[in-house]
Amino acid sequence: MQRSFEKEIYPGKWEIGAGGSALKGEDKIQAVKREIREETGIDTGELKEIYSLVHEPHRALYAGFLLTTSFDKKGIRLQEGETIDYKWISKGELIEHYESEACLPSTRERLCEFINSIR
C-alpha cells in the first residue's frame, strides 16, 4: 500500500500491507479485519499472526498478520486520505522490498523473524 502524500509520517512511502489501531472494545482480530476492510475493501480471508511485540515507551502492542484471500483484485477500494495506490507482490518481491532502503525501519524490525522464516 502506498501511503497518502497527506500523511504526516512517511508521506508517499510504500508499506507492506494495511495497518491501524484497535478501537475501544475490539480484540486484535476484529481490529485487523476492520482495518483491512477500511483500507482495501477486502472483507474475506484467512488470517495468520506472524509477529506480536510490545513497543516501549508507548506500551503499545503491535501485531502483524498474513492474509490469504481469493478476493477479486478488481474490488480493491483505497481509503481516501490513507492510501493512494497498491500492488500485489510475490514472496521474492517482498524480500527484495524488505532488504531495500525503501522499507520503513519499523517495518524491517517487525518483519525480521517472518522474512527469515520464508527465505
Regions found by a protein language model. Give the residues of each.
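Hydrophobic residues at beta-strand termini and immediately following loops
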Residues: 1, 50, 89
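Conserved Nudix-box catalytic region and its N-terminal flanking loop in Nudix hydrolases
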Residues: 1-34, 38
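Short polar/acidic secondary-structure junctions
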Residues: 6, 54-56
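Nudix hydrolase/Nudix homology domain
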Residues: 11-14, 56-119
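Structured beta->alpha junctions
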Residues: 20, 53-54
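Secondary-structure boundary elements
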Residues: 41-43, 72
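A short coil-to-beta-strand element that immediately follows conserved catalytic motifs
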Residues: 43-51
